[in-house]
Amino acid sequence: MNSLYIIGDVIDRHPGGVEILKIIKDTPNMFMLLGNHEQMCLDTLGPNSVYGSRRLWLENGGSNTYRELLYVCSPTERNRIIHFLSMLPDHFDVEVGDRKFHLVHAMPSDDPDDRIWRRPKPDDPPYFEDRIAVVGHTPTCYMSGDMESPFAVWHGNGLIDIDCGCGNKTELRRLACLRLDDLKEFYI
């Protein structure tokens, strides 16, 4: 059976993120990483809420998710979703064929905050000798410098960025999927 790895930021900016979370939660071959948007949700609605986090979350597109969780979901359903988010890892190490990958939302690091918030630079040296890091969080146009073409998966030195701006407002945005078996790219 094939597996789908989702490297975070499923919620926010557009309606329907909560429904997507439910599908991921209930699908055995879907694996999700914690992204900064899920962390902002946890910081606002989770059991260890952080003062000021609601404003940061809403300023970063969280209003749809906030309203869905507070006013559409039942308290039981909301608690299940918050629990699901609280159990998400912030990175995966996977092996596909003879390739090893380190999947992380934002940037490979020993620091958990960096793994969901920090942005790599296109000229960063490889993070690993034995595996390829696959990240999101930073739209690929900032890695490639190409602001005129539809966003495309960016391949660097031991680093692949797959964030093609799906959550952004630009018409150049796309949802990208990278098949790890052969690194073939798919776009919606």
For each of these PLM feature ranges, what is it?
Residues 93, 103-105, 177-179:
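Short, well-ordered beta-strand micro-motif
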Residues 4, 44, 49-50, 56-57, ...:
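Catalytic phosphate/metal-binding cores of nucleic-acid and nucleotide-processing enzymes, i.e., regions
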Residues 116-188:
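Conserved beta-sheet core of the metallophosphoesterase superfamily
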Residues 14-93, 99:
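Active-site neighborhood of divalent metal-dependent phosphoester bond hydrolases
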Residues 40-43, 94, 110-112, 142-143, ...:
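Short catalytic/ligand-binding loop motif for oxyanion handling, primarily in non-cytosolic enzymes
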Residues 12, 39, 108, 140, ...:
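Short, glycine/acidic-enriched loop or turn micro-motifs at the edges of active sites
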Residues 4-8, 32-35, 104, 133-138, ...:
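Active-site neighborhood of phospho(di)ester-bond hydrolases with catalytic His/Asp-centered motifs
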Residues 1-21:
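N-terminal active-site segment of His-dependent metallophosphoesterases
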